[in-house]
């Protein structure tokens, strides 16, 4: 989906946990390439300890978040306000138990969508991360610390 895919302003840790954050962009061309729309977002990737089922918590009111990926997972009828939850029905209980209410509130207050995929916790922001702002880096570091605390408590 899309063309001209590029990650930029990517930062990766060189020690455990192997965390990555950055910005991602691609373009959608319509009408034979005359109309180009750029879709961009910030992301954070943190490894998880256990085998957590794949799930996507997508902010209901942020249109750009719905375009991030083609959602192959079924939508859960019991969404977590203000998130639409996409996961297999049998996995909903496990997925919900991974995050505490403080973490969900932190993500909601900062308008992040998030997902569990292939052993990683991903956070998506509908827009670009502004890494030159100390509060952006502090916020991402807080999320990493919380996920790492959950990971360590499970192992």
Residue ranges and their predicted role:
Residues 1-155:
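Charged, low-complexity intrinsically disordered regions
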